[in-house]
């Protein structure tokens, strides 16, 4: 999940970099009434705040629309006289370094908050798993009783499907809990 969000963050970086190549810095985005750069930076700040929430999807939809709009207009413009693509790239990199580092740090802080919550939750998840495992004998005894009843009702095939499904679910849960244990045993993020 976090890797997907980081991919989205890369898309938002493109949004800001594209804003820097607008020939007319005073031109406003109709939807926001602000300049391209101001709009792009707002989207990035919002992303940093929403990195651990459902709000990210809506932000990314808006960001993609802005990127498309920026690119359409940029394609229709020529570079100013005396400006090479190399020089433009250098200017963009310098501007990005000054403007984006604080925003990236905010996004990083959001991801660290999510990781910290996972560290705090892991012991509880493992405790729940232990409880489930302690009841496994009861669970299989219940299934055995169902099997006995199913034989009388000639429902062997149906019960086999239920039992196979439960076995698959148990194996999946064990795999998930192994991942949780690894997360719990890893050092927490630096404060």
UniProtKB/Swiss-Prot annotation:
Plasma. It is found in: Secreted. Residues 1-23 form the signal peptide. One of its GO terms (biological process) is lipid transport. Coiled coil: none annotated. One of its GO terms (cellular component) is high-density lipoprotein particle. The keyword Cell membrane does not apply. This is Blood plasma apolipoprotein LAL2.
């Amino acid at each position: 999940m976090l890797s997907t969000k980081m991919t989205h963050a890369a898309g938002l970086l493109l949004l800001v970099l594209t804003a820097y190549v607008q020939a007319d810095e005073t031109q406003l985005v109709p939807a926001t009434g602000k300049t391209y750069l101001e709009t792009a930076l707002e989207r990035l700040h919002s992303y940093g705040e929403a990195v651990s929430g459902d709000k990210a999807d809506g932000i990314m939809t808006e960001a993609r629309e802005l990127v498309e709009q920026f690119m359409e207009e940029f394609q229709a413009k020529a570079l100013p006289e005396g400006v090479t693509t190399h020089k433009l790239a250098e200017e963009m990199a310098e501007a990005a370094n000054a403007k984006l580092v604080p925003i990236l740090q905010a996004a990083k802080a959001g991801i660290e908050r999510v990781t910290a919550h996972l560290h705090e939750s892991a012991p509880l998840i493992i405790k729940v798993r232990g409880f489930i495992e302690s009841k496994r004998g009861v669970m299989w005894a219940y299934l055995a009783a169902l099997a006995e009843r199913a034989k009388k009702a000639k429902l062997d095939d149906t019960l086999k499907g239920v039992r196979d499904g439960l076995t698959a679910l148990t194996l999946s849960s064990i795999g998930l809990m192994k991942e949780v244990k690894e997360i719990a045993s890893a050092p927490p993020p630096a404060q």
